[in-house]
Amino acid sequence: MPDRTTTFTGIHFENPFLLSSAPPTESESNILRAFEAGWGGVVTKTIGLHPVVNVVGAKAKFMRTSCEDAYVSMKKRPGAALHSSWNWELISDKTLDWWVPRIRRIKEAFPDRVLIASIMAGSGNDKELRNWQTLAEACQDAGADGLELNFSCPHMDRKDMGSNIGKDEGLCSVVTEAVKDAARVPVWTKLTPATHDIVVEAAACFRGGADAIVSSNTFPALPPIDPETLEFEINVDGLVSSGGLGGPAILPMSLCNMARMCQAFPDKSFSGIGGISDFAQALSYVLLGCGTVQVCTAAMLDQAVGPNVIKRLLAGFDLFLEHHALDGWTSLEDFRGIRRDRVVPQSAVRRPAGDDYQGGYEIVEGYAAPDRPAAAKV
């Protein structure tokens, strides 16, 4: 029997597949349904000290496209396939006091499953850092197995919250360190892809004591404009703000960010998110070095918590291990990270003639082209 279990940041998981912090994890009932369906872990909707008020109307929409009609739109069209999701939903609109007893009840119902509490506060002063600690202490005391720090929500108005933290290496380090000072459970930091160099922010989080990096959250994006009405396809009174793009469209970009971080920190722990709907996509993250993966968009489209998605993931995982049994692979750790080193600088990829390619520029003193790796064995 294939071994689905894994240990990630010291936490035992029945399987490496988690529902990410998002609308599917905004309620006790949804989280209980997710565990009943078979998910190895769930990350709660992000919890704050002060409840937010979301915009009126739809908080999320799905965009589709097709070969016959290739434009990307939120409009439902026959034969169109999923392209991406778009949302402008903020963090949980429930209080910390609302969440604490629910975390406790969920862990009592499923003690063998992993519940990670996603939390967020500001970062502008010492009081805000204490708010992070208050959230951390309350959630871990209620039974949360770990904490995920939301440094990545792309549409928080405050300049000291969400992705505005994730773009600032100093804040990444300071906030992580403050939470680690109060935490008795593992601390993960969830980073934004909307930064100049995600490796810099990852390094800052690790300096602050992070046990793992989660990447990535949604990419900042606007909804399409309807060519007939000239209005944004989702709006309130004609107005729109930047939201977050997720789903299949972000898979290649999220993999690129993950590859860079896994190469920079091969001995650290990473949880991959972005564009996962079956085991093939999850496998890509694991081969780069991820110890767990998280799912959102695909689950939202599958009864909110993805019962069929987790079945596909588990079946694909089992089949993959059975297929590679002769290679001696019995668990995720046997193949985690084995394609990490295949990602190289462009100049290191073989050219049809000669070995002296220098990147297309005149050789200057002090410049050294990257070493070309040996041909990869399949």
Locate predicted features.
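Short alpha-helical segments and helix-capping/turn motifs at coil-helix boundaries
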Residues: D3-R4, P24-L32, W99-R102, R130-T134
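C-terminal helical cap(s) of enzyme catalytic domains, especially alpha/beta-barrels
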Residues: P51-Y71, P223-G243, V286, A298-G328, ...
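Active-site beta->alpha loop and helix N-cap motifs at the rims of alpha/beta catalytic domains
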Residues: R64, E68-E169
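C-terminal extensions of enzymes
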Residues: V286-L287, V293-V378
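Conserved N-terminal beta1-alpha1 strand-loop-helix module at the mouth
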Residues: H12-T44, G48-V56, A60-Y71, P78-A81, ...
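Active-site mouth loops of central-metabolism enzymes
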Residues: F13-S27, N87-S92, I116-W132, W188-H196, ...
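N-terminal amphipathic alpha-helix/helix-capping segment at the start of soluble metabolic enzymes
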Residues: M1-L18, V100-E108
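Alpha/beta enzyme core
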Residues: L32-A37, G41, G124-S271, A280-V295, ...
